[in-house]
Amino acid sequence: MKITRFAPVALALALAAAGCSLESTDAAPAGTVKVVVGYQSKTINTVTAGTLLKAQGYLEQRLQKITDGGGAKYQVEWQDYDTGAPITAQMVAEKIDIGSMGDYPLLINGSRTQANERARTELVSITGYNPKGALNMVVVPNDSPARSLTDLAGQKISASVGSAGHGTLVQALSRAGIDPAKGVEVLNQQPQVGATALESHQVSALSQFVAWPGLLVQQNKAKLLYDGAELNVPTFHGVVARRAYAADHPEVLQAFLAAQLDATAFLNEKPFEAADLVAKGSGLPQEVVYLYNGPGGTSFDTTLKANLIAAFKDDVNYLKSIGDFADLDIDAFVEDGPLRKAFAETGRGDYDATLASGVNPSKVTGTDPICAVAVSDPALAGEVWVDGADKPQPAANPGCLLRAVQAAKAQGKTIRAVYVPDAELGTRWFADKAIWLREGTQYLPFTTQAAADRYRGSHPTAAPVSYEQAVTEVRG
């Protein structure tokens, strides 16, 4: 893969500065323990260790309990970045104590920090994951003729090298028969820079992590070309802590993990309210936040599952494909002891039972008000968000969902967003941005044209239909 790079020193400086918002405080007063938390407000499947955690004050509350019990005083400093790379740079410099980032950046974090015992990190929890890889996607301009990833051969693609979005691109290109080393030119850009490059047609595609693909599509600035779920490889974001800091202040790490469990429980129990808080804290539209963090989207589960760690081990070769990185012993890097202790101390369920579960803790439930049936199948269930409603209304299947939209429009109501799972891969997506097919009386939504084409290949009677047409013609 031809990669347009900065010089190493310039790159390091750029990563350390890019998209960094520091809520910096003065040095902690004598007798006060300071903890610096690096997070990514716009990488919204990390919110239980960042944006939502901060908004709810769970960490500060947990630390205050220690103080009230006769312990030390604590000071929390939050540092917001656009990607995981600058968080790693700050951890190498021993300036961030706890950070969150995606799976590929976590590999780099573990590799880069292990040379210095004071900087050395360990993976202590997961924030959110998708079992198939749907958290990373490739988008193209709306007027792009590309129908599948193979159409990008020889083109320029924007990605943040070392990010989860870039890692997915490398795997996807290989599977598509495109040589990742020579078949495309990757421009190493921060997400917002890449978004601008895509809009101005300086690049043919953008490969990024949440929430960028959904944001650009929701803003009508791009369309989805490749759904990372096609890889059928788990992707996740997680939390790393500096081992030296955790050894010096084990109570802080325990408080952080307990607070993360608090945030995770809140999000899974009240996803719509959580999306509002995250939208306000990140500056992202609530419709985009709820796309990824709503029921049936990202699985917010803190446990270090075997399938996630197995996929993580398979990703190690990625390190060597992008530069000179030291090998990383994943088994030594992963440490579940503190999280197990947090589960036991908080009473938030049984760790081993949660570890063994592969079910998304948050799914669409309730009674479909249009079809008057219970919503029971996550592979079909969607939601219709009518402006002014207390929360989105559930739909049992795509047909019921289209009827709900039809009814709302007939009543003159404004629809904020409609969410539906992809018929092939199950990825939660915007219904009005999906590719729809009609087969008899059945309506099938797909995230990408390639997915719809695959379906039509084995179902020749399925016919393309626009979302607007489907809403107009659907019948009970």
Locations of regions flagged by a protein language model:
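Bacterial N-terminal signal peptides that target proteins for export
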Residues: 1-9
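C-terminal motif of bacterial Sec signal peptides marking the signal peptidase cleavage site
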Residues: 14-19
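Bacterial signal peptide processing site
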Residues: 20-24
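Pocket-lining segment of extracytoplasmic ligand-binding domains
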Residues: 186, 192-281, 399, 407-426
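Conserved C-terminal helix/tail region of periplasmic/extracytoplasmic solute-binding proteins
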Residues: 320-365
